[in-house]
Amino acid sequence: MSHIIELPEMLANQIAAGEVIERPASVVKELVENAIDAGSSQIIIEIEEAGLKKVQITDNGHGIAHDEVELALRRHATSKIKNQADLFRIRTLGFRGEALPSIASVSVLTLLTAVDGASHGTKLVARGGEVEEVIPATSPVGTKVCVEDLFFNTPARLKYMKSQQAELSHIIDIVNRLGLAHPEISFSLISDGKEMTRTAGTGQLRQAIAGIYGLVSAKKMIEIENSDLDFEISGFVSLPELTRANRNYISLFINGRYIKNFLLNRAILDGFGSKLMVGRFPLAVIHIHIDPYLADVNVHPTKQEVRISKEKELMTLVSEAIANSLKEQTLIPDALENLAKSTVRNREKVEQTILPLKENTLYYEKTEPSRPSQTEVADYQVELTDEGQDLTLFAKETLDRLTKPAKLHFAERKPANYDQLDHPELDLASIDKAYDKLEREEASSFPELEFFGQMHGTYLFAQGRDGLYIIDQHAAQERVKYEEYRESIGNVDQSQQQLLVPYIFEFPADDALRLKERMPLLEEVGVFLAEYGENQFILREHPIWMAEEEIESGIYEMCDMLLLTKEVSIKKYRAELAIMMSCKRSIKANHRIDDHSARQLLYQLSQCDNPYNCPHGRPVLVHFTKSDMEKMFRRIQENHTSLRELGKY
């Protein structure tokens, strides 16, 4: 029989290191956060072999007193909290006193430090958690921590390390986040003698963004701010034309601490509405300042998860801050820049094709423009005026179905089929990207456009006061029709339609338990599920606004929505239907329209709340300014913008 014993402190530290120190990036994070808490204004991070051989952090903070240096390597020794009450008003990044002893237990650690006014500094060397020497030493005010041979005594950890490039990438990401969290501090990251990242430490967040993401990206970010009695929000988000393929470029900070929060990420996307393309994400650097009593940071070993009181109010503030800032912007993409991004420039000399002149003179006789046939016009007019039909998709019951014996229909989750659409739709699993986003669109100014031509039956050309505009006719009418349908889908009839064949829905045990608790929320929107066996629910009637062919996917989606967000909305669910209808009933590509219809479409577009994007986030129009034209024909040269000029933006 084994007996209970108290583990030696060194072994306990190694176990704790398993949670706190996962990889070299964890060492960098913990040591740099200590440097920030020490009041540093300059922090230099030097690494060798992606941190596995060496991590050295040098700061100019307060330092550690000589008689406290050894104490700093003991578990739960800290200067940041004194009693239980301090745990609920944490303003520092660290507070547990675990990082330094955990790092020392799995490495060779050398610490050199000095405080202001001391006659000398202190040098400490520890190997595997055991202190080998503590001696006086010469040192500037501040602290230098050198961590060598990481995981030398835990070879199993080394076995699972990724490539040096992958580990270096994690370190760069950590330093970048810290640089964005604290623009008042100068950060420098040096890997194997090469500087990877540097921030100026001027306190200007836009300059920190420029140092990390580049000057071009910094110029395309707009400032946001909002506040109430509990929260103060500030930061920058990118214009919709500057996006990335994942959420990694969204950085959220609470009281200077980088956090990960799904609901706040969703609030950011909600603020953009449908101005973002599906599957694209903005760059965002958002600082949230709150009373420490409203945030619990002591819920995760890495402190990246934070529980926030009044989270819904905070989400609303974030969304409103972004929506209000975007409302003040002209969101028509610059065509010349888009061309530069999408065109593959061939540097080889291209032989010019000689085109014979049709006439001997430069001018030709004016001819009447070709007109579409009566059939084409009729087809187009049907498409233009077809709105409003079949907004409610009721299943028609046939005599054969009425005479069939009753039975149970076991519902299955089936993938949606969007093969017949022009482009991919939002799937129901990501419905929170749909109506919540689309509902927040604000009216904004739209240029006066004078239509003058069409190309390939797809693009309309118009002239404005400040240049040439090219409009995608399908995307334009899709936006117009979507906004017509948007109000209609919210007017929901709560009447019920009996099902001749009830549906059985089955869920995992944990989901079934939570659904039972939240069933009243489903009933509020007309969905009545009754328990039917273990982890199963039966649906005997459906709300009349839900078409019968939508029942399986629709009920599962609404339940998923309820489990994920603790709320359910008919409008969110039906947003997909509005998007599909607007897509199917809009002018298709390669379809010529007459001048009157084109002008009418441009007028309708100008009346939209958001005339810049279709419901999927694709741009409706692009803009060539007069300056763009002059650049294309080399009439003017582009000026270079320096980092110093960022203050003008």
UniProtKB/Swiss-Prot annotation:
Instruction: Check the record and name the InterPro entries matching this protein.
Output: DNA_mismatch_repair_CS, DNA_mismatch_repair_MutL, DNA_mismatch_S5_2-like, HATPase_C_sf, MutL/Mlh/PMS, MutL/Mlh/Pms-like, MutL_C, MutL_C_dimsub
A GO BP term here is: mismatch repair
UniProt keywords (A-Z) are: DNA damage, DNA repair
> SUPFAM superfamilies of this UniProt entry?
ATPase domain of HSP90 chaperone/DNA topoisomerase II/histidine kinase, DNA mismatch repair protein MutL, Ribosomal protein S5 domain 2-like
Q: What's an example of a GO molecular-function annotation for this chain?
A: ATP hydrolysis activity
A GO term from the CC aspect: mismatch repair complex
Indicate whether DNA repair appears among the record's keywords.
Answer: yes
Q: Which domain of life is it from?
A: Bacteria
Task: Extract the NCBIfam families matched here.
Answer: mutl, PRK00095.1-3
* Family classification: Belongs to the DNA mismatch repair MutL/HexB family.
Function noted in UniProt: This protein is involved in the repair of mismatches in DNA. The hex system is nick-directed.
This chain belongs to the protein called: DNA mismatch repair protein HexB
User: Can you name the source organism?
Assistant: Streptococcus pneumoniae serotype 4 (strain ATCC BAA-334 / TIGR4)
